């Protein structure tokens, strides 16, 4: 099982940060690996919401379907892949702090095949990339660009 954590503090209210992160269609605006992202189920975002994400990982284009498995507004957002190269779970927690929001992201996966062989490299590269993307989100949100 591959697992890593990244975090940042964003100088915006927790409601704003949660709204941006929980809407998968915002991912390509701040994540360098997300090429496309769209909600595939109707209605507001909540438990059971589905989405399709096209990403580029280690130079490979990958398409995955995700489902929201936990949804606590302004507190926690969990999604799990339902298709794609390997099972993946993304847990994001939100903590209101003075002057902003603390965002913690945990990514867990069970790589198989090529990805299993490259697991140490994938974890290292993915952690660095995820932290960079979270820092980009911070910059965009603090500049009111998102």
Q: What do these predicted ranges mean?
A:
Residues 58-61, 70-76:
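Short, charged/polar surface micro-motifs in flexible loops or helix N-caps
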Residues 50-56, 77-83:
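Short beta-strand segments that buttress and anchor functional surface loops
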Residues 1-41, 142-145:
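Hydrophobic ligand-binding cavity/cleft-lining segments
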Residues 3-5, 61-65, 87-91:
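Short, surface-exposed coil-to-beta transition loops
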Residues 12, 57-59, 109-113:
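Beta-strand elements of well-folded, non-transmembrane domains
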Residues 78-132, 139:
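Beta-strand/loop substructures that line and gate deep hydrophobic ligand-binding cavities in soluble
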Residues 2, 45-49, 60, 86, ...:
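Residue-level preference for beta-strand/loop junctions
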Residues 14-15, 45, 69-74, 93-102:
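A short, structured loop/turn motif at beta-sheet edges
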């Amino acid at each position: 099982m591959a697992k890593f954590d990244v975090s940042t503090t964003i100088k915006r209210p927790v409601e704003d940060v949660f709204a941006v992160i929980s809407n998968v269609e915002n991912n390509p605006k701040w994540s360098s690996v997300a090429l496309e992202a769209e909600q595939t189920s109707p209605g507001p975002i909540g438990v059971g919401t589905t989405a399709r994400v096209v990403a580029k990982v280690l130079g490979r284009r990958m398409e995955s379907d995700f489902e929201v498995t936990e949804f606590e507004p302004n507190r926690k957002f969990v999604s799990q892949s339902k298709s794609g190269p390997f099972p993946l779970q993304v847990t994001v927690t939100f903590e209101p702090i003075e002057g902003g929001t603390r965002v913690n992201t945990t990514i867990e996966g069970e790589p198989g095949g090529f990805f299993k062989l490259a697991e140490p490299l994938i974890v290292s590269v993915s952690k660095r990339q995820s932290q960079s993307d979270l820092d980009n989100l911070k910059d965009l949100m603090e500049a009111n660009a998102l």
